[in-house]
Amino acid sequence: MRLNGAPYNNAELKRIAGYVMQSDLLNGCLTVEETLMYTARLRLPRTFTNAERKQRVDEVMADLGLSHVHDVIVGTPLKKGISGGERKRVCVGMQLLNRPQLLFLDEPTSGLDSVTALDLLRTFHVLAHGKSEAKAVTIVCSIHQPQAKIFNLFDSLIVLKAGSIIYQGPRKQAMVGISISFLNCSILIPFSFLSYT
């Protein structure tokens, strides 16, 4: 296995990659900005000043559409806070503070309604294609049965069925590659015809 053309190195992967879990583990009593500042203090190099940390947090909040809720608490089951989509964005922001080259997301749309899920994936699409070279990040995410609009945001796919790869390659060629194996393929919702039992 190789990473950036060199033999795989776990320390190098940790340096260049971020990982966002399906379930968030956020402190519901902190605001969005406090959560990101706390993470910045823990994860950014010690050479960063408080002003530089604050600038990075502000950039991440702007990139993820969180600036308008910077002073809203994350929330708890007993105290209302930000929405589920915003919680997911905060989790992503915590990983983006380091400006990773590679970001893994486990089921980022889980628990979100279709509109919020689409909005979140559109944000990921913008991040992946980068406003600048320094901010561009390769995003790898696992998603079960994406709606057609979400499916069309992906560049490349690996499609699994019963633990086996049935397609790997560009999204634009996926329907041709898979229709060879499956005749009842829906064009509107590309992978809804696959059985996951």
Which residue stretches match the model-derived regions?
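Conserved ABC transporter NBD signature motif
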Residues: 1-7, 13-15, 75-77
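Q-loop/switch helix immediately C-terminal to the Walker
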Residues: 15-19, 23, 28-45, 56-59
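Conserved ABC ATPase "signature" region
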Residues: 37, 52-73
